[in-house]
């Protein structure tokens, strides 16, 4: 059986910036930190909204959409996020309320409460479950950022099958900035159901507001990704393509708007 990266009550990194770096993003501090590592929200300086779309396997029924709204208040930011995957007969939704706070110039902490809802057509019905997340970011030395994130700290169980727990996912990564022009990211991710996955990504700023990205990840199947981003006035648009050895290319697009 081929896994395509989604399952009920699962957690999945969001944003085309993350996708273009093979999701090596646990150390990033953009608005997508609301889904990837809530500690990164503590570095948000303006109210922002973001939308994301992924067309997996070029099949509408496997597409994923997400939206985030975040507001900073001094050294704290509050965000709400929503993710949807599936189609009318089967779909998954994730609602999240996140808080990220800088505890000092070089450290931040974030938490999130999630509600997962799964819909089955016919006699199978619906079910929901609550989960918790926690994340940490720190800068032990100049230009080096360390990120750690734990999904399902509550060890919640799946209501559709009480003998099964919602997967616990641990992520740890490093990001190193080179002369404010390039960032190298490395990350390891351990899902309680699977072997550890290792990821690496590169983001390069060749000129102005243009960013080029690439990344690779290991796992049961080798994958690689590439993408680009461009900022114009209050908007940032990111596009990425990830490649699965067997299933082919998946396009990703996201847009961020600075509100006030």
Residue ranges of predicted features:
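Subset of outer-membrane beta-barrel
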Residues: 2-260
């Amino acid at each position: 059986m081929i896994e395509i990266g989604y399952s009920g009550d699962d957690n999945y990194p969001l944003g085309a910036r993350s996708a273009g770096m093979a999701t090596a993003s646990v150390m990033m501090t953009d608005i997508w930190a609301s889904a990837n590592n809530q500690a990164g929200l503590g570095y948000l300086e303006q109210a922002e909204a973001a939308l994301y779309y992924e067309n997996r396997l070029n099949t509408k029924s496997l597409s994923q959409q997400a939206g985030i709204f975040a507001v900073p208040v001094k050294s704290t930011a509050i965000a709400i996020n929503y993710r949807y995957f599936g189609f009318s007969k089967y779909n998954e939704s994730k609602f999240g309320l996140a808080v990220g706070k800088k505890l000092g110039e070089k450290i931040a902490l974030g938490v999130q409460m999630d509600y997962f809802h799964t819909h089955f057509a016919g006699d199978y019905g619906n079910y929901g479950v609550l989960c918790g997340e926690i994340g940490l970011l720190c800068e032990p030395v100049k230009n080096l950022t360390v990120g750690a994130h734990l999904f399902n700290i509550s060890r919640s169980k799946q209501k559709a099958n009480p003998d099964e727990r919602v997967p616990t996912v641990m992520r740890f990564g490093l990001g190193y900035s080179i002369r404010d022009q390039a960032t190298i990211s490395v990350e390891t991710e351990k899902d309680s159901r699977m072997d550890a996955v290792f990821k690496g990504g590169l983001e390069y700023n060749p000129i102005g507001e243009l960013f080029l990205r690439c990344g690779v990840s290991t796992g049961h199947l080798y994958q690689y990704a590439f993408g680009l981003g461009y900022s114009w006035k209050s908007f940032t648009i990111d596009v990425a393509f990830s490649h699965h050895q067997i299933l082919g290319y998946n396009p990703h697009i996201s847009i961020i708007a600075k509100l006030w």
